[in-house]
Amino acid sequence: MYSRSLSALAFTADFPPAAPKFHQRTHRVRLRNLGTTDKKSSHKIKYKKIPRVHQNLKGGFYMKITFIGATHEVTGSCYYLEAAGHKFLVDCGMEQGPDYYENAEIPVALGEIEFVLLTHAHIDHSGNLPAIYAKGFRGPVYATDATSHLCDIMLRDSAHIQMFEAEWRNRKGRRQGKPEFVPAYTMEDAMGVIRNFVGCPYNKMITPAEGISARFIDAGHLLGSASIELTIREEDTEKKIVFSGDIGNTCQPLIKDPEYLHHADYIVMESTYGDRSHGEKPDYVKLLSEIIQETFDRGGNLVIPSFAVGRTQEMLYFIRQIKADGLVYGHDGFKVYVDSPLANEATTIFSEHQYDCFDEEAMELIKKGINPISFPGLKISVTSDDSKSINYDEEPKVIISASGMCDAGRIKHHLKHNLWNEKNTILFVGYQAVGTLGRALIEGAADVKLFGEPVHVAAHICQMPGISGHADVNGLLDWAKAFEEKPQKVFVTHGDDTCLLYTSPS
């Protein structure tokens, strides 16, 4: 039914190659990205023009979709819909990164939005929920149970970051006579919207409003992630629109593979890796065990900068198997420190949702009484004193800490204590964005600055290839080809221009 190219899908969706003209490129990092000009902020906010999709069919059926974010970029997913006499959002994500297209303003008073349907907990899909709460939204947020629980910790963490950055900017700004910088939202806003979450099981139809029903289908991207099948009824007409969310990579550790859907009139589909194949997956357990062995034999530490939610739990899964199979010789009982408050809370939530989210391999371990993400020698650091004490442990050890790109969090302290020593290894297990400390290290920086001080890079720097929570071009097209009848339109989003329009050589 489909050719093997995302450009074909984009064309089917009438998503024109010239679409970048709708946008204004900006190079400013901005916390506040809802509303118009912020009089209290030190700069003005520009918004991109956005395409609106209207479907006015016989029988009185009318639906409008406004693409607020994740158009010609990956972050800031947000879709505003008017249908069956209701106004609502699918996702409400925050823009991330220093070089992006800014989200447009939601074209309605936020108090008029009745509800939000949320695909998953990642901040680029959920991170602006507290911001719309601060501006008047009081409706329910429907998400899977696991997503609701992850958002509880992730939105609170995001609010802490917003407030910390605003305080830091204002300390500098006051000395320069600049006006106060206002954070995107506060902890009170985050807690307010968290209280409005409604947890939903997979595959159960819900009715958030008259004439609108929705179903969450496992997307296999993150614990609790979902594609959303939305059914809209007006008079005698019924239309089905599917939002893919972020489609997961197959054969990920711990969580299930993405489920396919088979019927839709319209599809809104992501394209994060729409221009590339991940290639053959390496044996991660073998590769990681070899890195641990080589590092420990030198008498060094293995430091793993890791995303707190998802990637940290995958690393624990691999290390449990390494320990169980005795793949590291001469270092029995080696310690593994997880030093990230957010990662620790997320790991607890993973364990609480094993029965509805874990895959067959993980469930087989659980049936045998084995926790797939816990093992002897695992040490959880909670307090700052716990974190500091790791540096006094002279035994070779594994340290897993956030943030995954090394720009914030406790990982910076561990890099300061370990980068200078040639016995140690720094292992990157996730994407490193341009401009981050992690990117500088993998590109061979000889010296870096940490806490204002220069640190020489003598440690071994390496990467574990191929780890991704996103489907590649083949996985995306397999997901699209599962639809048994050709939809009326497919809208390709959540990717840069290359990914949107690229024709895969495979």
Regions found by a protein language model. Give the residues of each.
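Conserved beta-strand hairpin/beta-sheet module of binuclear metal-dependent hydrolase folds
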Residues: 63-109, 114, 151, 227-244, ...
